[in-house]
Amino acid sequence: MKAIIFNLLAWVMLPIMDGFAKYLSADLPVLQITWARYFFTVAFTFPIMFLFYSHQLKWSDKPKLQFIRGLILLTANICFFYSISVISLAKALTLAFVAPLIVTAFSPIFLGEKVGLRRWSAVIIGFIGSLVVIRPGFVEINLASLAALGTGIMYGFYLIITRKLSTSDNPLLTLLLTGVVGAIIISMVMPFVWVKPTLNQWSMMAAIGIFACIGHLFLILSLKYADASKLAPFSYFEIITNIIIGYYFFSDFPDNWTFLGLFIIVLSGIYISRRESLVKKVK
């Protein structure tokens, strides 16, 4: 029960972060908002790590892979923050939910895992769901929708690398290095895009980092009490929080096509999660 509560709390915290990012995107560059997410997350995470978990931290056995992982997540964050600056939170997140499908599709190549016909069918059906949301040929495809889809693709590869690192590196170190890599890279472009924030905007930028930090902390705590495969279906609670925030604060509500695509993608993701759990039990 603890695992479920922590997991659901994470999927409440992270959409709040997205809401702040969407609000700020009306006045600040997407890259600056992304910088705030990384800078303040690292600022809050560093002291916690070294005060309470320093004895568990040792240098990575795969530093190059850690760098690639951090770079991929940074790209995913930029794509997502750009997408929500243009389209609704719910539509952007729905398209980003293709991430588990990417993991399943590429795990035979990068992780050496065997994927059966049933899971391949679920992957194909899930991608059909993403096409239902985008509706190519029926409506004009905008860059924001493609960026949201790109978020899911990049996040899928991020999850694959996370699995590879889980066998060698401490997850707390992985979390810290991911933030540091992203913060260093995004800071390099700040002199070229920086817009001076107001005091209110500074507080919201800090809030993005705080909610990101708390959200990921809850995720780590949830994984302490239960396997990721068992918790995977609860991640779709994030879309409910996103819809509520989008409707209440931005007057955005998903259309019928988005709901249909979401339904298809979520069912595919849950089916894949259940099949993976069954396969592990058989082994």
Model feature map: region roles:
Residues 11-16, 46, 70, 74-78, ...:
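Hydrophobic/small/kink-forming positions within alpha-helical transmembrane segments
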Residues 93-98, 165, 169-180, 216-248:
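Helix-helix packing/entry segments at the starts of transmembrane helices
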Residues 118-134, 257-276:
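Hydrophobic transmembrane alpha-helices of multi-pass small-molecule transport proteins
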Residues 1-3, 35, 58-62, 130, ...:
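Juxtamembrane helix-entry segments on the extracytoplasmic side of multipass membrane proteins
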Residues 99-121, 193, 240-259:
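C-terminal transmembrane-helix exit sites in multi-pass transporters
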Residues 12-16, 20, 67-82, 150-161, ...:
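Hydrophobic alpha-helical transmembrane segments of multi-pass membrane transport proteins
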Residues 1-12, 43-68, 117, 167, ...:
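Membrane-interface interhelical linkers
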